[in-house]
């Protein structure tokens, strides 16, 4: 009886070990076996909680990064637009009043005209909006402005007083009127003008009119040299006819000049 009992125990042990090995082979690599799940029943829940906390922590970071990315764009949109670099024109404004003057802007804020062009008369006209321009002195780095009293002066900062309305006249000249200041009762515009001596006129003066020569300015800008439009045509060369061959004339032997004999006449008398 003891031997048979031992044999039964040995066979049952072999069967149990074989069954355990078969379950291990059938189970996938990522999932633990039944023994592991029984030993650590809270493993899956802990992993789920850790993954949820990771996603929750990543969400505010992503939102903060998105906010930081959107920040510069919003600040650029809110920044004020001064003028377009593509609309700049550099040159001088020539007024044909009197002997003719070039509008010039001084660093100390003075504005007048000079008969001969110089560094102070180099101006930069840029577009602010449709029909509205600003005038800046390149050398003085100040903007042309008109005060409430109609006086022309130079301003270090670009303000509403520096905005002028540019109009093209029929005689190819331009007029520049203040975009803000004008006569309240009649609505007459105040224009940039020079007198016969080259001094700046007040825009509020009743004599300053768009029909007067003192308000007419001719823009003289540097134009880029346009490339010469040229093309080449290939003409087939005409073959020249061959030169006619001259017949060869046989050279004759040089003739010998005959010997000349001189005779002296002798006269005998008696």
From Swiss-Prot:
It is found in: Secreted. One of its GO terms (cellular component) is extracellular space. Keywords: Glycoprotein, Growth factor, Mitogen, Secreted, Signal. Gene3D superfamilies: 2.80.10.50. CDD domains: beta-trefoil_FGF5. Residues 76-86 have a biased composition (Polar residues). One of its GO terms (biological process) is positive regulation of MAPK cascade. Transmembrane segments: none annotated. Pfam families: FGF (PF00167). Residues 1-20 form the signal peptide. Residues 41-69 have a biased composition (Low complexity). SMART domains: FGF. Residues 25-86, 237-257 are annotated as: Disordered. Its main location: secreted. One of its GO terms (molecular function) is fibroblast growth factor receptor binding. Glycans are attached at residue 112. Plays an important role in the regulation of cell proliferation and cell differentiation. Required for normal regulation of the hair growth cycle. Functions as an inhibitor of hair elongation by promoting progression from anagen, the growth phase of the hair follicle, into catagen the apoptosis-induced regression phase. Belongs to the heparin-binding growth factors family. Interacts with FGFR1 and FGFR2. Affinity between fibroblast growth factors (FGFs) and their receptors is increased by heparan sulfate glycosaminoglycans that function as coreceptors. This is Fibroblast growth factor 5.
